[in-house]
Amino acid sequence: MQTLAQHLTSKAVNESLSQLILTLADTSKAISHAVRHGALAGVLGATEQENVQGETQKKLDIITNDMLKDALKVDGTVRGLASEEEDHVVEVSANGKYLVCFDPLDGSSNIDINSLVGTIFSVLPAPAGELTETSFLQSGRNQLAAGYVLYGPSTMLALTTGQGVQLFTLHPETNEFLLTNAAMSISPDTQEFAINMSNQRFWEAPMQTYIADLLLGKIGPREKSFNMRWIAAMVGDVHRVLSRGGIFTYPTDNKDPKKPYKLRLMYEANPMALLVEQAGGKASTGYETILDIQPTQIHQRVAVILGSANEVDACLSYHGIDYSEEPTLD
């Protein structure tokens, strides 16, 4: 089996980007160790602090954020970083080539119940000039690499550098990420969907109707039965989609009219959308392709619908959009 370093060399990924990816991977090993120790190390539970989104921070949110920040500061390739747990962008190295956006511990509410969590990251080119928030406001199409590390029964890294999606598994004895799936592929059709049903009454009408039709199964207009899955961590639900197909959505809702969207564009939706597209799936807000969005702020939120291509198209048809054919540019 190829190690991660050997794989990056075989794919001719340039030296500086390879170095950055290896730094992220090495840091995830340390995060995996911290997650495994959990209560034994006294790192479970919440703090009295809130992040910029007004969410209560878990102890491990802060610990893992600091671990990634510290590692990227000494890596040498990073110009700046943006994190779910940081109010503002952080300048790292004046000579760095890359910007890194990350969610250090996605699904951290699962920590206290010993369920799935993960790290999500996105790598963008660093523009010339002074580093500001505007430096980061690039569409997802500009991503040079994206991935996540899933901390589950095995620690797994899903990675794309624009050459498909590869899956690596952390060997418990050698502590090396080894290539275990060279070409992850999302089946175009599915009978599984993932959504937080407790928000049903707050969804827009198109999503209400779409989910209602899925629940009707064989006697409904879809004429087949669907199963629902929900892990309450995007990283876990998207991993399932990449592994065996499905559709994952966190749609627009009016539960809090000031916050109609849940997931963050720069360090959740964009990297996951790139992985999904590279594996043959699709990713949309319901009204536009996620990777085509021009961001307006670092912590911008968006609706997310992603997964098996034909099922995403079916969902979008309820929104009055036909994505069954790729749009052509004049």
UniProtKB/Swiss-Prot annotation:
Cross-referenced Pfam families:
FBPase, FBPase_C
Q: Give the GO cellular component terms, alphabetically.
A: cytosol
| Ligand binding (Mg(2+) 1) | E84, D103, L105
Q: Which UniProt keywords apply?
A: Carbohydrate metabolism, Cytoplasm, Hydrolase, Magnesium, Metal-binding
Binding positions for substrate? D106, G107, S108, S109, N196, K262
GO MF annotations for this entry? fructose 1,6-bisphosphate 1-phosphatase activity; magnesium ion binding
Pathway(s) served? Carbohydrate biosynthesis; gluconeogenesis
Question: Which CDD domains does its entry note?
Answer: FBPase (cd00354)
For the ligand (Mg(2+) 2), the binding residues are D103, D106, E268
EC primary class:
hydrolase
Family the entry assigns = Belongs to the FBPase class 1 family.
Checking NCBIfam families in the record gives:
PRK09293.1-3, PRK09293.1-4
Protein name (Swiss-Prot/TrEMBL): Fructose-1,6-bisphosphatase class 1
Write the lineage as a comma-separated list.
Bacteria, Pseudomonadati, Pseudomonadota, Gammaproteobacteria, Alteromonadales
